[in-house]
From Swiss-Prot:
It comes from Halorhodospira halophila (strain DSM 244 / SL1) (Ectothiorhodospira halophila (strain DSM 244 / SL1)). PANTHER family: 3-HYDROXYACYL-[ACYL-CARRIER-PROTEIN] DEHYDRATASE (PTHR30272), 3-HYDROXYDECANOYL-[ACYL-CARRIER-PROTEIN] DEHYDRATASE (PTHR30272:SF8). NCBIfam families: fabA, PRK05174.1. GO terms for molecular function: (3R)-hydroxyacyl-[acyl-carrier-protein] dehydratase activity; trans-2-decenoyl-acyl-carrier-protein isomerase activity. Its EC number is 4.2.1.59, 5.3.3.14. The lineage of its organism: Bacteria, Pseudomonadati, Pseudomonadota, Gammaproteobacteria, Chromatiales. Keywords: Cytoplasm, Fatty acid biosynthesis, Fatty acid metabolism, Isomerase, Lipid biosynthesis, Lipid metabolism, Lyase. Belongs to the thioester dehydratase family. FabA subfamily. This is 3-hydroxydecanoyl-[acyl-carrier-protein] dehydratase.
Amino acid sequence: MVKQHSYNRDELLLSGHGRLFGPGNPQLPSPNMLMFDRITRINEDGGQYGKGEVVAELDVHPELWFFRCHFAGDPVMPGCLGLDALWQMVGFYLGWIGGHGAGRALGCGEVKFTGQILPDNRLVTYNVALKRVINRRLVMGIADGSVAVDGETIYEATDLKVGLFQNTGELNGA
């Protein structure tokens, strides 16, 4: 597979069906849980740590599913969905560099919310800077991330961890 440095919505949807990195390899969630419309930049040597970065965007419009249920009369994008987008991006990165297995979020350090995403906003920009990538028997990415809406940073998360697993049953003690 030739590495691209950006991906459109249709290409991301292929990932959700296991057709971008191949069967048994990392895949993004399908809609509605896919939390971005495109990846505008992905590389192995960018970001603040020089170990890789991913930048993705979500177009905001009032019809997005979460505005109908969170909250009635006070619509706001749940902060956990922005955090999940950052984990999705770390998992995508691990597949992009050739990691094998199913991706799972493993945790994070600190999370700080200083703003919100509302139906009248226009654009969410997610940024992930890889701090460490382990690509041996264990495949794991550790990154810092941020979420901006209409150019203003509103969430920050440190030490986002995603691992790739050959047998996800191991996570439940099976």
